[in-house]
Swiss-Prot record:
EC numbers: 3.1.1.96
Organism: Haemophilus influenzae (strain 86-028NP)
GO molecular function: D-tyrosyl-tRNA(Tyr) deacylase activity; Gly-tRNA(Ala) deacylase activity; Ser(Gly)-tRNA(Ala) hydrolase activity; tRNA binding
Name of the protein this chain belongs to: D-aminoacyl-tRNA deacylase
Gene: dtd
Keyword RNA-binding (UniProt): yes
Free-text note regarding domains: A Gly-cisPro motif from one monomer fits into the active site of the other monomer to allow specific chiral rejection of L-amino acids.
Amino acid sequence: MIALIQRVSQAKVNVKGETIGKIGKGLLVLLGVEKEDNREKADKLAEKVLNYRIFSDENDKMNLNVQQAQGELLIVSQFTLAADTQKGLRPSFSKGASPALANELYEYFIQKCAEKLPVSTGQFAADMQVSLTNDGPVTFWLNV
């Protein structure tokens, strides 16, 4: 399971011209699910996202997690994160989870994160437009 997390001052996701999710300060989480993923991996990744210390403390050091920074999460499904790009000029999605498994684990990941702080979401399998203001920029690839 993969999360590309970006520290943002704001982010939103639109579907068919309508904003369906938006946050202020927090993390934009692009979530990719691979075919070997399960709830245990989702639990580990949620814990890592919620506790990863990438917000500045009073000394301007990355020392606070999103909860301590009183931030929010915008979680967006992103199947292309599971792509294999090692060969050729076209990505292979053979490592990606089936849509049913990916949706189940996406919803489960959202539920786990929402137990700790405010969460907005994209729409699974939709054509979405995501806009953000990356704060830093600060972007990390988390894989469990």
